[in-house]
């Protein structure tokens, strides 16, 4: 698959100067030097996968890719509420929460659903229960992977969450409860200009790749004419 990716990029007339492991790029953007040195687990919850990377003594010591991510959350919502996928994604982003216990049962949402009725009222708490179930599964897989790696108990800096799913309300608290580690949301650091636009955990990898290129003084490349 890497060969296919390289061919694709070269086919667009772009010279590839280096390949960078995704957790290394994300870590470049969101981790502090102290976290890397002390011991931290970086969790990047993407659309279809979740990348887990353990940093100790300033270096990456263990990586793992889990075959689940934010799209599974959206799919669970679509199935549970019998609503189209795009509606489920919108509900997740606008009203989603990973801690249903913090939401009142009377908080209702009007949802487009399949069938003759077209719409129905759904409690936001029920939406959160659907999200919590899948989020717990992802976090428990991460905990299992940390224990399997042998670095359990060696991560005093805790966990840093990034990726679009990290922006989900309650995700940090749920992660802290399940893993028993300090947790924070990783936002890209050392930015100038359009900070409000890029300072989101969803842009961790993109910003990190740019910072990696600057740090390692990679040559600039531009599209080549056909």
Give short role names for the model-derived ranges.
Residues 97-99, 154-178:
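Glycine-rich phosphate-binding loops at beta-strand->alpha-helix junctions
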Residues 45-49, 53, 176-188:
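Acidic-glycine-rich active-site phosphate/pyrophosphate-binding loop
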Residues 1-42, 59, 70, 81-128, ...:
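Nucleotide/phosphate-binding catalytic cleft detector across ATP-hydrolyzing
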Residues 139, 143-158:
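Phosphate/pyrophosphate-binding loops at sites that engage ATP/ADP/AMP, CoA/4′-phosphopantetheine
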Residues 155, 188-189:
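Extended, low-charge hydrophobic alpha-helical regions
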Residues 9, 44, 77, 142, ...:
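Residue-level signature of catalytic and energy-coupling elements of molecular machines
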Residues 38-80:
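Glycine-rich phosphate-binding loop of actin/hexokinase-like ATP-binding domains
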Residues 75, 125, 129, 133-140, ...:
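Feature representing long, continuous alpha-helical segments
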């Amino acid at each position: 698959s890497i060969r296919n990716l390289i061919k694709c990029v070269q086919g667009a007339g772009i010279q590839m100067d280096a390949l960078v492991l995704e957790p290394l790029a994300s870590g470049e953007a969101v981790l502090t030097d102290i976290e890397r040195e002390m011991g931290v687990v970086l969790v990047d919850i993407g659309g279809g996968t979740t990348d887990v990377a353990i940093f100790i003594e300033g270096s990456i010591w263990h990586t793992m890719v889990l075959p689940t991510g934010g799209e599974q959350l959206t799919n669970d919502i679509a199935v549970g509420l019998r609503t189209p996928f795009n509606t489920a994604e919108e509900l997740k982003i606008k009203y989603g929460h990973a801690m249903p216990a913090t939401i009142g049962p009377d908080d209702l949402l009007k949802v487009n659903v399949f069938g003759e009725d077209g719409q129905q009222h759904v409690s936001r708490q029920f939406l959160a229960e659907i999200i919590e179930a899948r989020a717990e599964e992802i976090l428990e897989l991460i905990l299992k992977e940390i224990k399997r790696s042998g670095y359990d108990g060696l991560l005093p800096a805790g966990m840093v969450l990034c990726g679009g799913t990290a922006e989900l309300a309650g995700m940090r608290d749920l992660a802290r409860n399940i893993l028993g580690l300090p947790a924070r949301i990783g936002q890209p650091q050392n930015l100038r200009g359009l900070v409000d636009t890029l300072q989101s955990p969803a842009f961790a990898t993109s910003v990190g790749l740019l910072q990696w290129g600057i740090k390692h003084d990679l040559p600039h490349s531009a599209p080549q004419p056909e």
